[in-house]
From Swiss-Prot:
Annotated function: Protects DRG2 from proteolytic degradation.
InterPro entries with a match to the protein in the record: GIR2-like, RWD_dom, UBQ-conjugating_enzyme/RWD, ZC3H15/TMA46_C
Subunit structure: Interacts with DRG2. Interacts with androgen receptor.
Region Disordered: start-end pairs: 198-243
Native species: Homo sapiens (Human)
SUPFAM superfamilies per UniProt: UBC-like
Modified residues (N-acetylthreonine): T2
Protein name: RWD domain-containing protein 1
Keyword presence, Phosphoprotein: yes
GO BP term, example: cellular response to oxidative stress
Modified residue annotations for Phosphothreonine: T144
């Protein structure tokens, strides 16, 4: 007859020796304990971690222990679900023998896989962003390829803008036509300007002042009187140039 209590006590001692820093006893009856499992360091020393809680059933190891995710860090919901499925599979495969070390080892490997997946996912995201940036740069350099659809869209927009320009121009020309003077109006306007100049002079009358200083320097000019020349003949134009 199997002594389940003895097997459970022996395994507990072994687990405490293997996991001295992460093994914690929660209760002795029924035997319940936790083991914290941490992945290897990934990119930027990032890790994922979970604390597994186990409780021995009365006939363990012929019956599977009770287990649950007691706590976790950096795990997605789907990761937690995958770990629980893994524990169920491993417990089923190891019935009849003590299995906690085997279950913990399987979870340890799973956490390492998750870290690798996180690294791969980030690398793919980085490559995707670089690809999108490169495509955007190419698009900016080469422009948008002309298709029937985008040409028709451009044509409709162009026609609408052209129509607005024509309407604006017609409105300006119409407004200019209203303000444009006829030939008769231009003539009357010029005549009125002449009349206003004459009227200005008449109104000035004797009030117009002449600046005599403009003529003061005339006295300083040495003018030669041609009539004092004895050879000067008024009837002979060439006599003046005989000299």
């Amino acid at each position: 007859m199997t002594d389940y209590g003895e097997e459970q006590r022996n395994e507990l001692e072994a687990l405490e020796s293997i996991y001295p820093d992460s093994f914690t006893v929660l209760s002795e009856n029924p035997p319940s304990f936790t083991i914290t499992v941490t992945s290897e360091a990934g990119e930027n020393d990032e890790t994922v971690q979970t604390t597994l809680k186990f409780t021995y059933s009365e006939k363990y190891p012929d019956e599977a222990p009770l287990y649950e995710i007691f706590s976790q860090e950096n795990l997605e919901d789907n990761d937690v679900s995958d770990i629980l499925k893994l524990l169920a599979l491993q417990a089923e495969e190891n019935l009849g023998m003590v299995m906690i070390f085997t279950l913990v080892t399987a979870v340890q490997e799973k956490l390492n896989e998750i870290v690798d997946q996180i690294k791969t996912r980030r690398e793919e995201e980085k490559k995707q962003k670089e690809k999108e940036a490169e495509e955007a740069e190419k698009q900016l350099f080469h422009g948008t390829p002309v298709t029937i659809e985008n040409f028709l869209n451009w044509k409709a927009k162009f026609d609408a803008e052209l129509l607005e320009i024509k309407k604006k121009r017609m409105k300006e020309e119409e407004q200019a036509g209203k303000n444009k003077l006829s030939g008769k109006q231009l003539f009357e306007t010029d005549h009125n300007l002449d009349t206003s100049d004459i009227q200005f002079l008449e109104d000035a009358g004797n009030n117009v002042e002449v600046d005599e200083s403009l003529f003061q320097e005339m006295d300083d000019l040495e003018l030669e009187d041609d009539e004092d020349d004895p050879d000067y003949n008024p009837a002979d134009p060439e006599s003046d140039s005989a000299d």
